[in-house]
Amino acid sequence: NVPSDVHFHMLNDDGFYRKHYLPCMEKIRSERNEKVIQGHLMPMIDKCLNHYCLKYDIPKSPKDLMTSTEKSELASKVLDFERNPEEQLDATTPTDRIS
């Protein structure tokens, strides 16, 4: 399924992880306001969809790859994964996690 593949890509593509994912997680690490968290997370997800489409030559535009519901579910999945690092979700990942 696309959201799981995109989540795996976020965590395992070194270039994307270092340039976009990790800085986003650093920004939201101590944030408690959900709107601020989503304000950082959703643009990072959009960048990832673009990166994913370009890297794997996906014949869809990034905005057509996932519905807004799937993007929201992916955002929740990312946050859950970051907050519960001992629970392996879909991918093996580096150890920097939100506590």
Please give the residue ranges for each predicted region.
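Acidic interaction surfaces
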Residues: 1-99
